Amino acid sequence: MALRGSSFRGSLSDCMTLNAPQTIVHLEGDFGERRIKLDSISGKINKEFIINDAKSKVLTRKNRLPVVLFEPSELRLISSSPSRRRDFLDGLIARLDPKYDADLRAFNRTLLQRNELLKSHQEDSSIWRDNLFAWDIKFVQYATNIAQKRAKFLQINEPRIKNLYESLAGKDTQLSIEYGAIVPLENYDQALLNRLGKSREYEIVTGFTSAGPHREDFTIFLHNQPAIKVASRGEMRTIMLAFKLLELELQTEVSQSRPLILLDDVFSELDATREKLLQETIQNHQFIVTTTDARHQKDGCSIISTQ
């Protein structure tokens, strides 16, 4: 959190020392000095960043430092739910592209407002219909940006993911990725607007927006078949490991510095071959490993033990 401005876990309460009213983290490095202070007041947690004695409630993008997290749940993403895959892809792109991050936040706010309006449906109200159409236009604008950027990101980086996978697997393979847009991408905005119009009655009944990026998914193919159907457990985890190594490469390119790598009990999910390949890949980076197995300790590492 002190480096990137937010916790990977999402909840500030998870970052607090148990039963403590205040938690302070103090870091010093070639990036300067920074502290983050969390105060629990009447059940609400307040966050404050102190960077070289300058205080702020948020960490601006220019003060964020690149961090890449490897965690077990991401290695199981292929067999997980579409919503988990969407969150993974959105987070990956947003950490690299400030415009996408802003569009994603605006899209989620617009989706929430549109759903609230659907739930407050008023029969024969022209004002209500006009309001909904206005939200339709705004929703479609952000939805188009999100869907097209997701698809473009996967298309551009598919060859790199394939190469990384082959390096990890030690063999050539047929790997491809397809973004499952709910309407054609080439005229996404107009097609989505038409789709919403046709779904109006259904959406009024359910109170939810039935189409858009929040209902879309991407599929990974291995040997021209969905990986979820034909890939072994080890192959699935190798594919997701390739995604994370892609993030490591892209973060390095964007930030012009080597990211800090966090390995959260990941080695327990890998066999000996993939563990060795991962260690070789990250050996020139600074990394922090959490593990319950002493075999994963590397020479020259500082070790902090907890019981």
Regions found by a protein language model. Name each.
Residues 1-2, 246:
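DNA major-groove recognition helices of helix-turn-helix
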Residues 2-84, 93-96, 100, 158, ...:
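Nucleotide-state sensing region of NTPase/ATPase domains
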Residues 20, 72, 180-182, 292:
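Residues that form or immediately flank small-molecule/cofactor binding pockets and catalytic motifs
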Residues 32, 39-43, 273-307:
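C-terminal lobe/lid and adjacent interdomain/linker elements of RecA-like ASCE P-loop ATPase modules
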Residues 33-35, 78-79, 186-187, 296-299:
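Switch/connector loops and helix/strand junctions flanking conserved nucleotide-binding motifs
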Residues 58-64, 71-137, 141:
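A conserved P-loop NTPase coupling/switch region
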Residues 127-260, 269, 273, 277-280, ...:
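Conserved NTPase motor "head" modules and their coupling/switch loops across ABC/AAA+ ATPases, GTPases
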Residues 264-266:
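Walker B catalytic acidic pair
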